[in-house]
Amino acid sequence: MKTTIYRDERICHLKKYAENMPIYGIYKGKPYSHILKIDGFNKRQIVSCYNVIQGVSSDLLPMSLHKFAHHLNSSQILCYNFFRPMLTESGRATEKLVMLLEKYGIKIELGSECAFEYNDGAGDGTEFDFHINSGDVEVFFEIKYTEQGFGRANDDDKHQKKFEEIYKGNLLNEEKCLIEKPGYKDFIRDYQLYRNVIRITNKNKFLILLYPKANGVVHKQADTFIKDKINNRYKENVKALHWEDVISDKNCELCCKYFG
């Protein structure tokens, strides 16, 4: 399904979750029924009340909320709604999360440290929607919902400089996760994916791209990238998973809200 059609269908479904809001939120000067009004309100409180699903605690909601976290199709809040029930009060992995990862061939320990909006301090500004640290094992999550694809970069002096000074030397680590080192044009086209995949420096590091299969543009981009760019030895370390498969309870509130 084309991304724009998928996005329109999802927004049409999601707008009923803002029915209790007296006034729609504004985007580029226009009101939209799937956007929560935050002007004059505490954004974090509005997101907690209306975008975090009922029964899910807001206590671990990231301090660095995305600019559009008050949009009901926010992939950041979808990520939070999905993973928060699998964590303890202190943000550690429960048996439910351990079993989920095991289903996809990744073994983590009970009580592993987890974080939303994780930055590994590498200096390139990359943040992952969700991250698990389990001893030598690390799992990085990139979450998509109604986005138009994985992020591209502008072809400008800024990104040319970043490519030369930061990424060029890291795009082929000793383990050679990538089949070949990309050129600049290739790099900026799949900018977000390359920024993510350079974290896979050994067989204990995993990148999970989690998105709706029905989002055709995202699905094609992820599938093509893994097929054409990832070394066969690392195909199991870069996984494309679909929300439709990962959510086991099709009648749960999360599934009804986002995929109903």
Where are these regions (language model features)?
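Short, well-structured alpha-helical interface segments that form or flank functional binding sites
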Residues: 73, 77, 81, 123-126, ...
